Amino acid sequence: MRIRPADAKDLDAVAQSYRDLLMHEMEQTGYSNWKFGVFPTMEISHRAHNRQELYVAEVKGRLIGSMILTERQPKEYKNISWNTTSPDEKILVLQVLCVRPQFSGKGCGKSLLRYAGEMAREMGYSAIRCNMWEGNEPAIHVFRQMNFTDAGSGPFRPEGLPEEQDLFMEWDLNGDDRNRY
């Protein structure tokens, strides 16, 4: 598996991976609380790509997952009692981590998180923060396995969606956790 910054040629495949996941969730159990045609969208991936914040995972040239890594913290983050007290410029935010359903459970999500942690450490960040719908139990389980700790829960409004109750999580990159994953 190769993880790298996204190229413009990846954008269609990223959008298709969002559709694949949402179609799968419509047919099976849905955990993301995302909505088909509303969130996430091609526009979100374009914006992230233009800001150089979109990363993709691929196997043999086929996109199997993606994530957004940004320094911009959503306004709701101000209401959370985070475990680390680092200044904002030392925080990286992980958003819209998506793994194609046929690759779920095969380590792609963990590899993306591992990459985010390694990259953040190299760039001098002290923590990675994220949030997800409280009902996304599979993702919560994986994030906890990968050094993220719960920081609290509260309302969050994803772009274009109604407000939901989210779990806010944080990975303290200065902690002695490198052997956990």
What are these regions (language model features)?
Residues L22-I44:
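Conserved GNAT-fold acetyl-CoA-binding loop/helix
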Residues I68-V96, S104, R157-G160:
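Conserved acyl-donor/pantetheine-binding loop and adjacent beta-alpha core of acyl/acetyltransferases
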Residues R2-Q16:
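A short beta-loop-alpha structural element at the N-terminal edge
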Residues F103, G107-Y115:
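Conserved acetyl-CoA pyrophosphate-binding loop and the N-cap/start of the following alpha-helix
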Residues L113, A120-N131:
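Conserved GNAT acetyl-CoA-binding A-motif
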Residues W133, R144-M146, F156-Y181:
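C-terminal "cap" of GNAT-fold acetyltransferases
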Residues K110, E122, E134-G152, L161:
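Conserved active-site alpha-helix within GNAT-family acetyltransferase domains
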